[in-house]
Amino acid sequence: MSQEFVGRWKLIHSENFEEYMKEVGVGLITRKAAANLKPTLEIKVEGDLWYSNQYSTFKNTTLSFKLGQEFDETTPDGRTVKSVVNFENGKFIHIQKKIKDSDKESIITRWLEGDKLITTLESGSVVSRREYVRE
């Protein structure tokens, strides 16, 4: 089931993304730049190792993980968090746990809805929704 996510996805719609970035502590200049991007998300799997690569004109990022195993993650804006990604009920659930007291925790959920990949990003009371289609 999770294999259906593999491929390249182009962002077509975004709601509340700048508000989400503000909630998790992303700086103003980075927020403004990132809010206007239309990145491509590439999801790959090799054995039990998953890759989530994001490409944009601003920055390219790579995240690799094994489902259910906690790992150290450096977010695109440079924050360090403890993360774990699980696959439950047809959804990838990515939990970012804060390390410093000043940081915020976040939950990123991805699922397929028709021909779209839907991503929600939640922190505190802020929820962002982003929609992607296959390239």
UniProtKB/Swiss-Prot annotation:
Keyword Transport part of the UniProt annotation: yes
Swiss-Prot/TrEMBL keywords: Lipid-binding, Transport
Domain of life: Eukaryota
Recorded GO CC terms: cytosol; nucleus
Keyword rRNA-binding: no
Binding site for a fatty acid: R110, R130, E131, Y132
Sequence similarity: Belongs to the calycin superfamily. Fatty-acid binding protein (FABP) family.
Identification of the protein by name: Fatty acid-binding protein homolog 6
Lineage: Eukaryota, Metazoa, Ecdysozoa, Nematoda, Chromadorea
